[in-house]
UniProtKB/Swiss-Prot annotation:
InterPro entries: ARM-like, ARM-type_fold, NOP9, Pumilio_RNA-bd_rpt. Residues 1-52, 484-505, 664-697 are annotated as: Disordered. It comes from the Eukaryota. Gene3D superfamilies: Leucine-rich Repeat Variant. SMART domains: Pumilio (SM00025). It holds the Pfam family PUF_NOP9. It is found in: Nucleus, Nucleolus. The lineage of its organism: Eukaryota, Fungi, Dikarya, Ascomycota, Pezizomycotina. RNA-binding nucleolar protein required for pre-rRNA processing. Involved in production of 18S rRNA and assembly of small ribosomal subunit. Belongs to the NOP9 family. This is Nucleolar protein 9.
Length: 697
């Protein structure tokens, strides 16, 4: 059967493509010219093989409209540039620099390569993280130059998915240097590539210029997905407040924020941004104006709607907090203040507009965060009305609710002794239900506040004892779920394995562990409930608890807490005998072994027995990183070579000598010559005294 005649080869394929494009072009010229429309998202997702040509008249009319609506595009890095910055990121990750000077030279070389491409890198998905790391390792002058490159583009950068993170890092790292005086750059320090001199503006002036760039857009940026985080950082910097981007519980960290770790050379200076920093006096006026502008265009209804908005709520929290902490509690009386607009009636009487709004936020996952901020920062009069008219009437239901319980905890942290005593009596009937449902946030806060306010915790201990089993061992199982801690290996299913190799911890078990640790701090019946349970628990269960990262902290607390008695430790510690090797080689168990060193100061014979077990396993311990740390903490080299000195150290005699010796210096042993000099001086002094007495007589 004859085959169809086909042309083969690259040239034939190119010829067919040219003919096909020619046919399409001829067909398009026959159709009437239509007005060009902005492509939809579906059209943008598909690659366009052919773009139709419009007449010049339509093109001139439509291009300005597109420029007004589209986000500015700063271009893409070419292949060679991508490869260079990828290799630079790998070099930083390996961190094989011998000195800090080598690292600074490398950072400067990256800046040289990035000249003129700073905006491209900041908007690049693959290179923006590298820029964040470089900013963290840069000097103040390098950051100032980069700041100057970003000026004029911040309105677009703060709304960009990747560039916004670079802006945040730049603001945070530059903030501690705001109080430094700006020196005039010499003529040699001129950027030659584009003929632009090093920015003459000070860092404070640069921040003020950022504010002017964003001015007029605050209302929109409050709820913008990426810009809201950067706006919060900017507000904190203006206020001189510490900014911690790594903390997921902070007001500025995103839930999906990926940590950008920076490896530093030993001895390299690190700028700590978790402390208050000095800011120019003009910043306070700017901060007040910015906060006023943010809410000036919003009516009260929309402002209250931000309380339940998942993006606007954190900004609203920050505005309330900064308003009350930096401009005084008296600002709450100003009708234009954020707090006054949210809560116009500070009496908080039942049925009032303020009470209805406040009550509606108590059980809302987002709104309750704002309530916590208000409770923590509100003036005393407003807080007392909130506690009296809203919290106390609903205290039972608040303690049972998973979300509202955190608001109750904030109230317990602030109330006085008499009010705390009343709240304790009202919450105690709910304790059995809370223990059964593992809602331990409120009971733990109650114990903590009672210890601070010096309130008797015996009624709380009785309520706990009645809600738990009478058998001490079973009681501890109910408190800690020790049956679920089956061993040192905390394996997770493939789908549950966490990112970055961190072991996944059960939130319920973590809360129970923290609750039991807080019980151990309370003297009397509360701590006795735990101590009796530990003594009654089997050795296998105790060892499993010691090898669990969560329950191990309970055992460490039981051994080192001030409420721990010598009698308890003498009964409890022998359970670890013959298990020291297993514990010393385990990540969690090794911390317990370290705690045993301090816990056995007054029971030396037990410490000596445990040390002998470690000495018998010397080879295995020295082969393990964790084991070597235990070997060092127990001074096992001293144990093997100079047993007498180790004995004194094990009994804590060295600490007593250091406490008696001022400054911790070793007392100098006097030589025979020093003693002879002292005797001679004493004899000379006595002879002089006798001669003076004879002269007087």
């Amino acid at each position: 059967m004859p085959r169809e005649k086909q042309k083969r080869g690259r040239r034939a394929q190119e010829k067919e493509k040219r003919e096909e494009n020619k046919r399409k072009l001829e067909d398009d010229h026959e159709e009437p010219a239509l007005k060009r429309q902005r492509p939809s998202s579906e059209d943008q997702a598909e690659p366009a093989d052919y773009i139709p040509l419009d007449s010049g008249e339509h093109e001139e009319q439509e291009i300005p409209v597109a420029d007004q609506n589209d986000t500015p595009f700063y271009g893409l890095l070419d292949t060679e540039e991508q490869e260079y910055f990828s290799r630079a990121a790998e070099v930083l990750e390996l961190n094989q620099f011998q000195t800090a000077e080598e690292q600074s030279i490398f950072v400067e070389s990256v800046y040289e390569e990035a000249k003129g491409k700073e905006l491209k890198i900041a908007c690049s998905q693959s290179c923006s993280r590298l820029l964040e790391k470089i900013i963290s390792l840069s000097s103040t002058d390098q950051r100032r130059r980069l700041f100057g490159k970003f000026l004029g583009h911040f309105l677009n950068l703060v709304q960009h998915r990747f560039a916004s993170h670079c802006c945040e890092t730049l603001f945070v790292k530059v903030a501690p240097a705001l109080s430094h005086k700006t020196h005039n750059a010499p003529k040699k320090q001129i950027i030659e590539e584009e003929g632009n001199e090093e920015p003459s503006l000070s860092l404070a002036d640069m921040f003020l210029q950022v504010i002017s760039e964003l001015e007029g857009n605050w209302g929109y940026l409050l709820t913008e997905r990426f810009a809201s985080h950067t706006i919060r950082v900017l507000l904190l910097v203006l206020a001189g407040e510490p900014v911690d981007l790594s903390s997921h519980g902070s007001l500025v960290a995103s839930k999906a924020k990926e940590g950008v770790e920076v490896h530093r050379i030993e001895g390299q200076e690190r700028v700590v941004s978790t402390k208050h920093h000095a800011v120019p006096d003009a910043f306070m006026d700017v901060l007040k104006k910015v906060m006023a502008d943010m809410t000036a265009g919003l009516d009260d209804t929309y402002l209250r709607a931000l309380a339940t908005h998942h993006i606007g709520n954190p900004v609203l929290q920050l505005l309330v907090s900064l308003e009350l902490s930096h401009f005084g509690k008296s600002t709450a009386k100003d009708s234009r203040s954020v707090l006054r607009r949210l809560i116009p009636d500070d009496t908080m009487e039942e049925g009032s507009q303020s009470a209805i709004f406040f009550t509606g936020l108590l059980y809302d996952p987002v709104g309750s965060r704002l309530v916590e901020t208000i409770v923590r920062s509100a003036p005393g009069k407003l807080f007392k009305n909130i506690h009296k008219n809203i919290i106390r009437e609903r205290i039972a239901s608040l303690s049972r609710n998973e979300i509202a319980s955190y608001v109750l905890v904030r109230c317990l942290e602030r109330v006085g002794r008499d009010d705390l005593q009343t709240d304790l009596e009202m919450i105690i009937p709910e304790v059995p239900n809370l223990i059964e449902r593992s809602r331990l946030t409120v009971p733990r806060a109650l114990i903590e506040r009672c210890l601070i306010r010096n309130i008797d915790t015996t009624p709380l201990a009785k309520a706990l004892q009645e809600s738990l089993d009478k058998d001490p061992a079973k009681r501890l199982q109910q408190l800690l779920e020790v049956n679920n801690t089956d061993g040192p290996a905390e394996e997770a299913t493939p789908s549950e394995k966490p990112v970055q190799g961190k072991p996944k911890t059960s939130p319920v078990l973590l809360h129970k562990s923290l609750f039991v640790q807080k019980m151990l701090e309370a003297p009397g019946a509360l701590s006795e409930l735990v101590y009796s349970g530990l003594i009654a628990t089997s050795t296998d269960t105790i060892i499993n608890m010691a090898c669990n990262s969560v329950t191990s902290h309970v055992l460490q607390k039981a051994l080192t807490a001030p409420t721990s008695t010598t009698q308890f430790r003498r009964q409890f510690i022998p359970q670890f005998s013959s298990h020291m090797k297993q514990l010393a080689l385990d990540t969690s168990g090794s911390h317990l072994v370290d705690a045993l060193w301090d816990a056995t100061k007054d029971i030396y014979f037990v410490k000596e027995r445990l040390a002998q077990e470690l000495a018998d396993s010397e080879h295995d311990l020295r082969d393990s990183f964790i084991g070597r740390a235990v070997w060092k903490n127990w001074s096992m080299d001293l144990y093997k070579r100079r047993r007498g000195e180790w004995k004194g150290k094990a009994k804590g005699l060295d600490d007593k000598v250091k406490a008696l010796n001022i400054g911790g210096e070793k007392p100098r042993t006097k030589s025979k010559l020093d003693l002879a000099r002292e005797r001679y001086d004493a004899s000379q002094k006595s002879a002089a005294d006798r001669s003076s007495i004879g002269t007087k007589s």
